[in-house]
Amino acid sequence: MSSTYAVVNPATGETIREYPEIADDELRAAIDRADRASRTWPGSSTVAERAALVRRVGELHSERRQELAEIVVREMGKPIEQALMEVDFAGEIYGFYADNAEGLMADEPIELLGGEGTALIRRSPFGVLLGIMPWNFPYYQVARFAGPNLVIGNTILLKHAPQCPESAEAMQRMFDDAGFPEGAYENVYATNEQIEWVIADPRVHGVSVTGSERAGAAVAEVAGRNLKKVVLELGGSDPFILLGTDNLDGAAQAAAEARLDNTGQSCNAAKRFIVADELYDDFLEKFREKLAAAKPGDPTAEGTEVGPLSSRTAADRLEDQVKRAIDNGAEVVVGGRREGNYFEPTILTGIEPGDEASQEEFFGPVAQVYRVGSEEEAVELANQTPFGLGSYLMTNDKEQAERVADRIEAGMVYVNLVGADSPELPFGGFKRSGFGRELGRYGADEFVNKKLIRSA
C-alpha cells in the first residue's frame, strides 16, 4: 500500500488534505500509457489538431481562472492577485504555442553552398518526456514545458512538487477536458526514488527539471548514465545593477517589485542590488521605504503584496541564512523578523563579496545591497556567483548598457525594465543556473528530432 503525505496551508498551518504517493505498479502503468500514446498519437493527429487541443487548455485557464488561483493561494500562500496573473500568463503561453505550432514544426530549407538538389531539416516528436516541476509557479512552469511539447506530439509524464498536488489535479482535469488522448499528459505523484528508475526506463526519452541546483544535479547524473537529454532551469542570484537613473523613486519601486515577486520565491527574482556610489545612499533610503511598506498579509486578500513562505522548511532555511549573514557582519536595514511562515521584507548591507551569503540564493523577501565605485566593479560583483540566470540593469547611458549587457554572465539581461517575461522570449541561464531553454522558438526546439533530408 502506498503511503500518504499531508499538504499544509502555509498561511494558516491547517492541513488541506492527505495525498497518496503513487505505487510502483501505477507509475509503470502511467509510463505504459505515455509510451502507447507516443507511438500512435503523433501519426494519427495533425499539428493543427494538436494545436487546437493546446489552445483549449489555455482557454480553460481563463474559464477556471478564479478556481485555479485560489488553489495555489491555499497550497503555497501566493497572494491572490499574483496567483491570478500566473494563471493568465500560463494561458497566454498555451495560446502562443497553438498560434505558432505550424511554423515551429515546418520544414526548414537549407541553402546549399554548392552542387545541385535541395536540403531541409524536418522536425519530428522526441517521444515520452518526464517533466519535474517546482511548487512556486505550478501553472506557469507546466505551460512552459507542456505547451510546446504537446503541439510537437511528445507525450508527458508530469511530476509536480509535493506541495501542490491540488494544482496538479486541476491541470490534469484541464488536459482531460480539452480532449487529449489517454497517455498524452499523465500526472504522477512520484517519489525521488521512483523518479530515478523512471528516468532510466528506455521508454522515457528526455527530462526537463525546474528546481534547485541540487535537484538538477541529481537528475542530470541519472540521465547522463542513461544517455537521456536533459534541460535544467535551476537557481539564480540575479543582480540588479543601478548605474544611472533620472527617477530614483521609480528605480526603487522597480527594485522592490523585482525582489518581492512571489514573496521573493522566484528563481529569476533580483536578489543582489549593486548600486553606484553616487546613488547608493538615496537609493537605499527609498528602497527601505518601499520594502517597509510591503507588509506581509493574508494571501487571500486583495492588495496583499507579500504572503507567507511556502512551508515551515522554507522559512527555517531563510531565517538561518539571514542569521548566518548577520553573524558574519551583515547589517539589517529593515525587516529581519519572522512570524510563523511569514518573513518580513528585509534589506541586508555590509556583506562582503565572496562571503557565504553573497554566494547563496536567498529564496524569500531578502535583498542584499552593495555599493560600487565603478562600472568595472559592478560587472565583477555581478558575475562573482556560481549562478547566471537573469540580471537587471538600469542606466541612462545606451553605450554603457551595451557594454555591461555584453559582459554580464547570465542567460537574460533586462535593461531599464523588470517583469518582462513573454511567451516568445527564451528563458534560461548560464553556469550553475542550468542549460537549455524554455519558451519561444528555442524552447520548442529542445525536445524535437531534427532530420536532414538531402535530395539530388
Question: What do these predicted regions represent?
Answer:
Residues 1-117:
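N-terminal Rossmann-like NAD(P)+-binding subdomain of aldehyde/semialdehyde dehydrogenases
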Residues 35-38, 42, 58-65, 69, ...:
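Structural signal for hydrophobic packing residues in well-ordered secondary-structure cores
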